[in-house]
Amino acid sequence: MAHEKRILLPQDLRPIHTLDAYKATGGTRGIDRARSMKPRDVIEELKKAGLRGRGGAGFPTAIKWTTAFEDPSPTKYVVCNGSEGEPGTYKDRYLLQKNPYQLVEGAAIAAYVVNAKNVFIGLKAKFKREIANVQRAIDEMVKDNIIAKDYIQIVPGPDEYLFGEEKALLEVVDGRGAMPRIMPPFLQGARYTPTEYNPTIVNNVESLSHVSHILAKGADWFRATGSQDTPGTMIFTLCGDVKRPGMYELPLGTTLRELLFDCGGGPAGNHPVKAVFSGVANRVMTEEIFDTPLGFGTMRTAGGGLGSAGFIVYDQSMCMVKVALMFSSFLAYSSCGQCIPCNRGC
């Protein structure tokens, strides 16, 4: 399947490891345009584009940014969630390996819109290569006067599933362990105090990477592909019992069957596909819903879930009891145990 790559580099393009190389592809045009606009107009551009968060919930980005923008609090922050702990998902790390500049640019645009005091990028401390790439991008943009020194900071975090939960991520940003807070980021943000709640935008790597391109090329360009429910493209990680595991950037609205068979080449062995999971907490997906268009609303309506678009495939040779044991063991180990269903096993 041949589709336009928007944030995932084409196979014939080398990784972008310098700011000059990024600019040669049109990089930094997004932030230049954003800064020539009023902050509310930038939000309107994202609203027109229909960008939804690519981290799992699919929440409209424009609504999230509007909440922070309209809040009268004098101190606000932007946080990028780059922890990526969902089994079967690798796309954010891949983006940071190949082109960290689009993330830094997107984060800087978000910071401009809400007049953020600082930007924090949360990455697992073990992501050594990705941390080095992002820091290099930050340093080059500082040298080029695109962002101020120390304005965007990397926050290394633990190798824990909970680090990817946005309220737990904020705890790590504040120097504590990865245990989720009760209040959401717009009511209890980074560096909060009893008198200052510091509303905070939290977006993941893929979401912020899209922002830089939307501002550079416009909402109509973004909506030219994808579906009404979920415009644009999304990166799908495909692994397990398929011939061609990997990462595929596809228009939303592409069917699950096309992802599995046209991109992934179908089952790797002689057994048909038995089950597909889009994350360990989502329900099992079987043949009956393979023709469902990939999108947040369409997958939910079909009884499945899009999640962060990491798909694990099992063929008929796999024992589903074994899979259930693996998934439940992972969730039991990873749970924070703060709410009743996980604490009591209800």
Regions found by a protein language model. Give the residues of each.
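Short loop-to-beta-strand transition segments
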Residues: 64, 119, 264-280
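Histidine-anchored nucleotide/phosphate-binding helix
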Residues: 99-113
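Gly-rich Lys/Arg/Thr-decorated short loops/hinges at beta-loop-alpha junctions or inter-strand turns
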Residues: 22-28, 80-92, 191-194, 237-242
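N-terminal glycine-rich phosphate/pyrophosphate-binding loops that anchor nucleotide-derived ligands
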Residues: 34-76
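Local cysteine-cluster metal-coordination motifs and their immediate loop/turn environment
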Residues: 48-62, 161-163, 274-283, 304, ...
